[in-house]
């Protein structure tokens, strides 16, 4: 629905098209479907309960397939409880290697070593700094630390054309270090980028770190992920648990394992409500089934 949205909407309502691929625009009230039979939700963890229920309400008997590398606690709990069917794709693409993951306290020496090693083998680097207010200062620091690096900045508050140019420069290797926010979490596939450094990884969620880590290692080259943190005393206990789990789960296809740990850390959410994480207090699965 990104191109010619009005024409696409009319075609869907009239049944003139068999497949409609869209963003959240499909949730608009003006979108109607003549005979909706199958709904596929990609990156399911990025949708809220209300959004998913809105999609289901488009037709009472629609078949729904949700896809995600890391199911949110509520969805995983429903699958493990037998309320939803679950299938796991555990076989990685050919020649893919697991991403070596390191959790370290941030030092200039570590940052310089990680970036320099990637650049020396002709690769590219993502440097995640999820604070727009200070991202330009961070980019300048990296440029001063590694003068040979060609550094660009990308974040969601940039003008669309400016951001497109940045991503084009990085994709075509006119730049080799992208200092960015979590805007790269999905939809980015650059095989030559095989090192990602996440500053203040303790502030990121478990599924989010896994998604971000998946931006590298998309070819046959060994990829590296550095999760930079402050002193452990500054971090919350849940943050420490998340980082321990993510550093241990390096194997390809580890998303399901991470999701089960996320379920343990955050809780299962509400079966009848809108919370997608959190510990149930008023009702459990057994009582729900009896109801």
Q: Which role fits each region the language model picked out?
A:
Residues 1-20, 24-25, 102, 143, ...:
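Conserved nucleic-acid-binding Ia/Ib motif block in the N-terminal RecA-like helicase ATPase lobe
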Residues 1-20, 30-36, 160-177:
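Conserved motor-coupling elements within RecA-like helicase/translocase cores
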Residues 5, 28-34, 44-59, 163, ...:
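Conserved ATPase-coupling elements of RecA-like P-loop NTPase cores
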Residues 11, 24, 55-58, 79, ...:
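Amphipathic alpha-helical segments that mediate coupling or scaffolding at interfaces
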Residues 17, 24-26, 43-45, 183-184, ...:
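Conserved Walker B
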Residues 19-22, 40, 63-69, 78-79, ...:
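Structural recognition of the conserved hydrophobic beta-strand(s) that form the central parallel beta-sheet
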Residues 108-126, 130, 134-137, 141, ...:
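C-terminal helicase module of SF1/SF2 nucleic-acid helicases/translocases
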């Amino acid at each position: 629905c990104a191109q010619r949205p009005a024409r696409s909407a009319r075609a869907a309502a009239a049944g003139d098209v068999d497949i409609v691929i869209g963003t959240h625009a499909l949730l608009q009230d003006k979108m109607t479907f003549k005979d909706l039979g199958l709904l596929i939700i990609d990156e399911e963890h990025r949708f809220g309960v209300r959004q998913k229920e809105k999609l289901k309400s488009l037709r009472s008997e629609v078949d729904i397939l949700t896809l995600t590398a890391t199911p949110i606690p509520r969805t995983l709990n429903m699958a493990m409880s037998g309320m939803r069917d679950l299938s796991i794709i555990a076989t990685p693409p050919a020649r893919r290697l697991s991403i070596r993951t390191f959790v370290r306290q941030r030092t200039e020496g570590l940052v310089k070593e990680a970036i320099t090693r990637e650049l020396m083998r002709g690769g590219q680097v993502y440097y995640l700094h999820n604070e727009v207010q200070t991202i330009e200062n961070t980019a300048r620091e990296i440029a001063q630390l590694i003068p040979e690096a060609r550094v660009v900045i990308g974040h969601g508050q940039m003008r669309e054309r400016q951001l497109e140019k940045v991503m084009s420069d990085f994709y075509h290797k006119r730049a080799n270090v992208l200092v960015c926010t979590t805007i790269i979490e999905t939809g980015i596939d650059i095989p030559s980028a095989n090192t990602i450094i996440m500053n203040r990884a303790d502030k990121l969620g478990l599924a989010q770190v896994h998604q971000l880590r998946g931006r590298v290692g998309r070819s046959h080259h060994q990829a590296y992920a550095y999760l930079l943190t402050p002193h452990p005393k500054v971090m919350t206990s849940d943050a420490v648990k998340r980082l321990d789990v993510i550093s241990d789960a390096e194997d390809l296809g580890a998303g399901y394992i991470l999701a089960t740990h996320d379920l343990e850390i955050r809780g299962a959410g509400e079966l009848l409500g809108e919370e997608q994480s959190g510990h149930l207090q008023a009702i459990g699965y057994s009582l729900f089934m009896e109801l």
